């Protein structure tokens, strides 16, 4: 059983990017830093939205305090998030699907490099 408790410290509305930017505090005395997945699940449950619209940008733990602060972006639509969020953030938050996106991007990058090399010759 996990002894974590979460609290939303700050909410900022970013209408230009169609998202809410949250600062979430996680208190986890005598336990490890909470996972991205657990933070995503808690935020989605609290706001009553789909977990696919929630992306954890960073979790910063204060040394020796048993407290972490997480930066979370909550989008109105997951399609907007896939355009705006960097690929590495998508990969960290989406698990297997994110790894596939990362592999596809690497493949495209390598194809462009090969094409550029052939063009130089």
From Swiss-Prot:
What UniProt keywords are attached to this protein's entry? Ribonucleoprotein, Ribosomal protein
* Family statement: Belongs to the eukaryotic ribosomal protein eS24 family.
Please identify the protein, giving its name as recorded.
Answer: Small ribosomal subunit protein eS24
- Asked whether the keyword Ribosomal protein is assigned, the reply is yes
Q: What Gene3D superfamilies does the entry give?
A: 3.30.70.3370
Offer one Pfam family short name for this entry. Ribosomal_S24e
Molecular-function annotations in GO: structural constituent of ribosome
Question: Record's superkingdom?
Answer: Archaea
Family annotation (InterPro entries):
eRP_eS24_sf, Ribosomal_eS24, Ribosomal_eS24_CS, Ribosomal_uL23/eL15/eS24_sf
A single Gene Ontology CC annotation of this entry is:
ribonucleoprotein complex
Gene Ontology biological-process annotations: translation
List the residue ranges forming a coiled coil, or say none.
none
List membrane-spanning regions.
Answer: none
């Amino acid at each position: 059983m996990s002894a974590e408790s979460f609290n939303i410290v700050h909410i900022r509305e970013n209408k230009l990017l169609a998202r809410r930017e949250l600062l979430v505090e996680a208190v986890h005395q005598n336990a490890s830093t909470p996972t991205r997945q657990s933070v995503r699940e808690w935020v989605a449950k609290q706001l009553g939205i789909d977990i696919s619209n929630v992306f954890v940008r960073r979790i910063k733990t204060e040394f020796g305090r048993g407290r972490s602060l997480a930066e979370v972006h909550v989008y109105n639509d997951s399609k907007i998030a896939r355009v705006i969020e960097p690929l590495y953030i998508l990969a960290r938050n989406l698990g297997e699907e994110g790894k596939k996106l990362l592999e596809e991007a690497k493949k495209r990058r390598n194809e462009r490099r090969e094409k550029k090399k052939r063009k130089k010759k």
